[in-house]
């Protein structure tokens, strides 16, 4: 049931017989009795017998099962008591008890005045179902234990969950907030603090394997976390897990380190909740994508099973919709919405829907969220949020870094940008600025100069003293992962993938056939737009993070994929870009003076062309054609002219690009297609004839040019550069692989995971999309890193619980903007003297600090995070991510700190169920 595959989605299965393995024809009676003895199904009697039977059948002998059936659940027995109960000699029964404890059928403690060892038959969850999953070697030998734990933590609760009161009624686990989120609270009580429990069990801690992570991994639904050492046993349980090879002792400082790393990764702190307010035996650090305890509230939409006494609240005036709280929220309680007033809402900020709760409503499976692991990762309310973040392919937190820059917090602004874009200094120079096209401020006067602010912030990366090298945040206690990953191509997609894999704790190896990194950034974009030292500076940061770069290596020629597999590489990210060009298929184009744009730009950027006399004709109307034309002008061509099929309004090149080309001296002729290149007697280019293009696209928007063959124009030329498309040069890279190619020889892959038909090969950037922009490749590289991390970790799914990246822009026609005054947009200074002196140097200056302050003040602050209190479980993780002090925990639900013993669950359930029934019957709230 491994879910590593393209296009796979997963929904929690309904509880039904199809998921229960049948009993054997002649079941072992002792095991059947043990199943009946151990399971309290509340309102479900039969669903678990199959998994229970097979798990207990593998875990216990008949003799052991008979002994277990004589023990009362959760009642401690000393050795003399067990000898008396079973009639066995103490030595014999002690060995059996120790054997069953080692397996996980029993636990033990010394909780009596004499500190005598006593054995306990635990409940299934939390209890023996977990213990059976906590030793990885045992679990791999008995994989049925994984499904037993999964079902035992769900089936018995399915009808009881709506009746669970605040505090959890002694069932399972209980969220305990991040300590620093409530350390200033004057109303908190001791049991709400992790420090209280660490003090209570001071000096008695052990780190152990997370049974949920281990179980899900065996089932093929893992989240790619390393299961080891996330759970902290306290008190006598620490001795139990150490003595039964389930964990190892840790110091208090090590506990703090585990808790800190858990918070960095967005894991929820939970404590056991079956022994009342005077005892716990474990602190877990839970990933909602695999945690069975959090599932009890999330699947059934019954938050009382998890929530703490606290609720997150947003101060909208401080919130900048950066999305950090949304990304980390395990319950999907935080989503991005808007801060601006809405016309549809009567000139007010919109009201947002809240999750229905079972408190006064009939509750059945139609109220559940079977796909909660994905649904909780949807980031935006349907009515939308800040258009800038939505429009950016990488979904950079634009509003957030503008605010940080406005406050002079440049280091934090750079860190925030790099959460989604590892190449901000590059993008600050070459991005196509879709965020600015979408900017709401453009409806008032002019869009905020977002890219110029980003460029200013990212200048810090060009100086070793101020650059930002992100820390490794890895979901393993081992310090990092040792799986070898190969990235083929050091363009923007490959660099992005390397960055985010390194940030996750890998040491990726980047293979680049050229002698320098950057791909088309280095060999395609003119240096007067993007200086090569900018690229080198940002690549150096990726190297410092742990990535290795091997230049001058062409995979497929110098080393094959199979040879890399033999060297231990477990996954490949192929991001070689579109390094070839296309010709028009016309007479004369095979002449020496006819070239394609990518080759021309590569030669210029490699220093192989330092002068270009004569007349240069460029065929094409995109941004690459513009780059060719501007290079030709700066290299001394006496006449440079571009010819394109499209009208001026249809030209792919942006208006700004066209203007800059004209300023450089290029001429642009629209509506012409190449017909024939003319050669002189020596075979050199002397001219080119164009024919009038009457239509570029058909009625359905497909590229289908038509021409007037009688309307011709001949122009003199000394060289022709074709910029009418790019191609992928695969070479022998994919030889022998199962990777399938589609239109334009682009690789076919799953649109979410980027996994190809060859499971260990992922693709991204231009080899998947066709020629596009750097920011698109950067976004793809980030997502590929997520997929590859999941792929190389055993038993992990590529799809379950991923951030969905479904950002929706607010309706700019609906927002109320009349109260905003006009404020002119800042413009970067252009140093024409420097441009004349050094035509290939960067001549557009970076904003000054004063300009940054003025420009960031123009941001309207469109977006805000919205917290649904009905979904919030009060974990406090959101508070650890917010750089703006905009979200806090309030103790609005003190009743949720009511901790009772498991034995009190039925009275607790009954009392609450009665109140609930009255509310439902009489329609009270």
What are these regions (language model features)?
Residues 33-35, 56-57, 196-199, 203-320, ...:
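Ferredoxin-type iron-sulfur electron-transfer modules and their immediate structural context
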Residues 74-86:
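Short acidic, hydrophobic short linear motifs in intrinsically disordered regions
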Residues 86-102:
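Short amphipathic alpha-helical interaction segments
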Residues 101-112, 334-335, 887:
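A short, conserved structural fragment
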Residues 115-154, 909:
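Short, amphipathic alpha-helical interaction segments positioned at domain boundaries
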Residues 396-399, 405-406, 447-451, 487-555, ...:
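Beta1-alpha1 glycine-rich phosphate/pyrophosphate-binding loop at the start
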Residues 457-478, 504, 537-557, 581-635, ...:
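Glycine-rich dinucleotide-binding loop and its adjacent helix/turn
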Residues 533-582, 595-612, 634-744:
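A Rossmann-like FAD-binding core segment of flavoenzymes
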């Amino acid at each position: 049931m491994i879910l590593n595959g393209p296009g796979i989605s997963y929904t929690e299965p309904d509880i039904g017989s199809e998921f229960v393995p049948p009993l054997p024809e002649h079941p072992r009676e002792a095991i059947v009795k043990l199943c009946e003895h151990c399971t309290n199904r509340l309102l479900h009697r039969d669903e678990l017998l199959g998994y229970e039977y097979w798990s207990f059948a593998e875990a216990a002998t008949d003799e052991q099962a008979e002994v277990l059936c004589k023990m009362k659940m959760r009642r401690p027995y000393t050795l003399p008591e067990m000898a008396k109960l079973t009639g066995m000699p103490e030595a014999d029964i002690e060995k059996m008890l120790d054997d069953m404890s080692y397996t996980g059928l029993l636990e033990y403690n010394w909780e009596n005045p004499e500190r005598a060892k006593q054995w306990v038959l635990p409940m299934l969850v939390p209890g023996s179902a977990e213990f059976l999953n906590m030793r990885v070697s045992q679990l791999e030998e008995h994989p049925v234990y994984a499904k037993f734990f999964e079902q035992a933590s769900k089936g018995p609760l399915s009808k009881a969950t709506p009746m669970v009161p605040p505090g959890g009624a002694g069932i399972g686990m209980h969220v305990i907030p991040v300590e620093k989120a409530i350390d200033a609270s004057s109303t908190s009580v001791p049991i709400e603090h992790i420090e209280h429990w660490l003090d209570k069990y001071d000096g008695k801690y052990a780190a152990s394997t997370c049974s949920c992570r281990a179980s899900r991994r065996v089932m093929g639904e893992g989240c790619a976390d390393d299961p080891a050492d996330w759970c902290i046993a306290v008190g006598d349980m620490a001795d139990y897990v150490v003595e039964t090879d389930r964990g190892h002792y840790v110091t208090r400082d090590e506990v703090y380190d585990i808790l800190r790393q858990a918070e960095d990764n967005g894991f929820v702190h939970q404590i056991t909740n079956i022994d009342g307010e005077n005892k716990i035996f474990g602190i877990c650090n839970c990933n909602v994508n695999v945690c069975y305890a959090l599932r009890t509230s999330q699947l059934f939409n019954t938050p009382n099973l998890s929530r703490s006494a606290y609720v997150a609240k947003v101060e909208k005036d401080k919130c900048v919709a950066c999305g950090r709280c949304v990304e980390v929220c395990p319950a999907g309680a935080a989503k991005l919405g808007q801060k601006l007033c809405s016309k549809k809402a009567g000139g007010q900020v919109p009201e947002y829907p809240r999750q229905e709760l079972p408190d006064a409503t009939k509750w059945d499976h139609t109220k559940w969220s079977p796909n909660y692991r994905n649904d909780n990762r949807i980031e935006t309310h349907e009515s939308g949020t800040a258009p800038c973040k939505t429009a950016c392919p990488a979904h950079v937190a634009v509003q957030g870094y503008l605010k940080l820059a406005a406050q002079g917090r440049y280091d934090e602004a750079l860190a925030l940008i790099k959460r989604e874009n590892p190449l901000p200094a590059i993008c600050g120079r070459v991005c196509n600025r879709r965020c600015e096209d979408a900017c709401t401020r453009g409806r008032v006067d002019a869009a905020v100069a977002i890219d110029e602010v980003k460029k200013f912030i990212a200048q810090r990366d060009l100086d070793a003293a101020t650059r930002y090298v992100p820390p490794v945040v890895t979901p393993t206690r081992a310090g990092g992962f040792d799986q070898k990953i190969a990235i083929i191509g050091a363009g923007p997609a490959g660099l992005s993938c390397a960055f985010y894999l390194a940030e996750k704790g890998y040491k990726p190896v980047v293979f680049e056939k050229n002698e320098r990194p950057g791909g088309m950034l280095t060999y395609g974009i003119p240096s007067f737009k993007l200086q090569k030292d900018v690229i080198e500076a940002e690549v150096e940061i990726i190297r410092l993070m742990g990535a290795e770069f091997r230049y001058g290596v062409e995979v497929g020629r110098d080393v094959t994929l199979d040879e890399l597999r033999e060297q231990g590489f477990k996954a490949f990210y192929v991001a070689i870009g579109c390094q070839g060009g296309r010709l028009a298929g016309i007479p004369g184009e095979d002449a020496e003076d006819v070239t394609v744009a990518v080759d021309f730009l590569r030669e210029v950027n490699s220093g192989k062309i330092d002068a270009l006399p004569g007349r240069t004709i460029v065929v094409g109307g995109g941004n690459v054609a513009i780059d060719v034309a501007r290079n030709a002008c700066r290299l001394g061509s006496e006449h440079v002219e571009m010819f394109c099929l499209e009208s001026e309004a249809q030209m792919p090149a942006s208006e700004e690009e066209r203007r800059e080309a004209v300023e450089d001296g290029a001429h642009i002729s629209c509506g012409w297609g190449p017909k024939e290149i003319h050669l002189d007697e020596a075979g050199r280019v002397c001219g080119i004839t164009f024919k009038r293009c009457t239509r570029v696209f058909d009625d359905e928007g497909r590229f289908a040019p038509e021409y007037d063959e009688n309307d011709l124009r001949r122009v003199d030329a000394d060289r022709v550069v074709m910029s009418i498309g790019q191609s992928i040069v695969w070479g022998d890279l994919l030889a022998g692989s199962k990777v399938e190619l589609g239109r334009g020889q682009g690789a076919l892959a799953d649109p979410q995971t980027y996994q190809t038909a060859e499971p260990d090969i992922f693709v991204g950037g231009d080899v998947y999309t066709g020629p596009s922009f750097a920011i698109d490749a950067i976004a793809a590289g980030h997502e590929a890193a997520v997929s590859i991390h999941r792929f190389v970790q055993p038993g992990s799914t590529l799809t379950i619980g991923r951030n969905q990246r479904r950002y929706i822009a607010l309706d700019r026609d609906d927002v109320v903007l009349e109260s905003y005054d006009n404020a002119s947009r800042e413009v970067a200074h252009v140093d024409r003297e420097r441009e004349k002196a050094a035509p290939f140097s960067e001549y557009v200056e970076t904003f000054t600090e004063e300009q940054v302050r003025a420009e960031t003040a123009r941001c309207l602050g469109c977006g805000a995070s919205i917290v649904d209190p009905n979904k919030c479980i009060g974990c406090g993780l959101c508070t650890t991510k917010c750089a703006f002090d905009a979200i806090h925990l309030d103790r609005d639900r003190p009743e949720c700190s009511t901790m009772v013993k498991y034995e009190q669950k039925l009275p607790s359930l009954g009392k609450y169920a009665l109140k609930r029934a009255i509310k439902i019957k009489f329609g009270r709230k």
